[in-house]
Amino acid sequence: MARKTLRARRFFSLIFPFFFITSVYAEQTPVSAKTVTVEAKNETFAPQHPDQYQSWKATSEQSAREDALAEDPRLVILWAGYPFSRDYNKPRGHAYAVTDVRETLRTGAPKTAEDGPLPMACWSCKSPDVARLIQQEGEDGYFHGKWARGGPEIVNDLGCADCHNTASDDFAQGKPALTLSRPYAERAMEAIGKPFEKAGRFDQQSMVCGQCHVEYYFDGKNKAVKFPWDEGMKVENMEQYYDAIAFSDWTNSLSKTPMLKAQHPEYETWSAGIHGKNNVTCIDCHMPKVQNAEGKLYTDHKIGNPFDNFAQTCANCHTQDKASLQKVVAERKQAIHDLKIKVEDQLVHAHFEAKAAWDAGATDAEMKPILNDIRHAQWRWDLAIASHGIHMHAPEEGLRMLGSAMDKAADARTKLARLLATKGITHEIPLPDISTKEKAQKAIGLNMQQINAEKQDFLKTVVPQWEDQARKNGLLSQ
């Protein structure tokens, strides 16, 4: 009866920037090679779908920024040599998708369309303009070049055309018209035996979210987005896949380990949990059916915590009261957090001990099995913690991954102790003071004053040019 009830209730200054920047970006005018049907301006659909649009717009209320590095400075060491050691904030509302990727220190401070540390692929989950560009340029064309190339093009926040076929008759008639607007996501679903077009309505609801809330990597010369699901979606399956192709996201600057960085694997972890196994979808919990002022039901697009809409979400299946379920979730969250910190402590020591071994003259052959253990330990830890809701989606799987991460980290440290002893080092390897984010960043050699200054200059000069160009090209509303 509870399941039947659930199914019944479903559904961004400066005006005159520097001339050289102006000239660089003014050359970027869109050339449409194909017929483009994706309308990326979300406000276009407000008259037709007012309740959905206003609730989507309300994600701007989710404006608080939580600095994960300040909260847990160990992360700086684990990501030494990678942009995440500069800046890592917890996610906030969809209305900030474009703003946040522009403002994060991870994307650097490019001055031209060919400048900067990251590829175009870093826009891929931020805007319906991505779907528009893929349709216009093809996947290879979209992925080609640096992240800054997309600045004047990708300007509308994650919204309608990311999940809905807004050009379809069904959408015009008020139906969801769900779609996978990223072809690479469609291929990934097929790889795990879930072709989108053959999936049922409930499966499609989660698959649409799974275009972005997933683990992915940048493949080949073009740095195209690919999901590592060829061997399956469990942490070991993806680890095996990455090892087989000898892939690494970066090399840790302390231990010289070829590392893997997990992204936001909510689809994978949800699939492994009790809700996923029972096909309780992302929409059921995060986008419930609610009533407008006239009593008409619509799908709430202010994606958020299910407890904020308890009667329309959890209570559809659970008989416990809100306080009881909150207590259960809090206990699971604390258990995962406690084990997470223990694994991080082991990994921090392992990275510094590996550095000491290299400094003492260790060879590549001696270090290879150790670095492999560090790689696998941190990968398993990261896949567990990068999914911010794992304590709700799959707590048992989270604890299992963290447990295996602890075992791998212990294996690495045991081998390091033996290797260091052969080099005449039997004392404990001391750690620098990493008690704050700032001290940890100093310990790995980051010049944060320079990095921050360059970013502020970028935001004051380049970004306004992007927006001006987008308005001239009709990509942003005036």
From Swiss-Prot:
Pathway(s) annotated for this protein in UniProt: Nitrogen metabolism; nitrate reduction (assimilation)
Signal peptide limits: 1-26
Note describing how the cofactor binds: Binds 1 Ca(2+) ion per monomer. Binds 5 heme c groups covalently per monomer.
Record-given protein name: Cytochrome c-552
Reactions performed catalytically: 6 Fe(III)-[cytochrome c] + NH4(+) + 2 H2O = 6 Fe(II)-[cytochrome c] + nitrite + 8 H(+)
Binding site for heme: 122, 125-126
Origin species: Salmonella choleraesuis (strain SC-B67)
Cellular component GO terms, alphabetical: outer membrane-bounded periplasmic space
PANTHER family: CYTOCHROME C-552, CYTOCHROME C-552 RESPIRATORY NITRITE REDUCTASE
Main location: periplasm
An example molecular function term from Gene Ontology annotations: heme binding
Residues binding heme c 2: 160, 163-164, 301
Cofactor: Ca(2+); heme c
Subcellular location: Periplasm
Residues annotated as binding substrate: 216, 264
Binding positions for Ca(2+) per the UniProt entry: 215-216, 261, 263
GO terms, biological process: anaerobic electron transport chain; nitrate assimilation
Enzyme class, broadest EC rank: oxidoreductase
Keyword set, alphabetical order: Calcium, Electron transport, Heme, Iron, Metal-binding, Oxidoreductase, Periplasm, Signal, Transport
Annotated positions binding heme c 4: 282, 285-286, 393
Binding site for heme c 3: 94, 209, 212-213
Chain's role: Catalyzes the reduction of nitrite to ammonia, consuming six electrons in the process.
Family (UniProt): Belongs to the cytochrome c-552 family.
Keyword flag Metal-binding: yes
Pfam family, one: Cytochrom_C552
Entries under InterPro entries matching the protein: Cyt_c552 (IPR003321), Cyt_c_NO2Rdtase_formate-dep (IPR017570), Multihaem_cyt_sf (IPR036280)
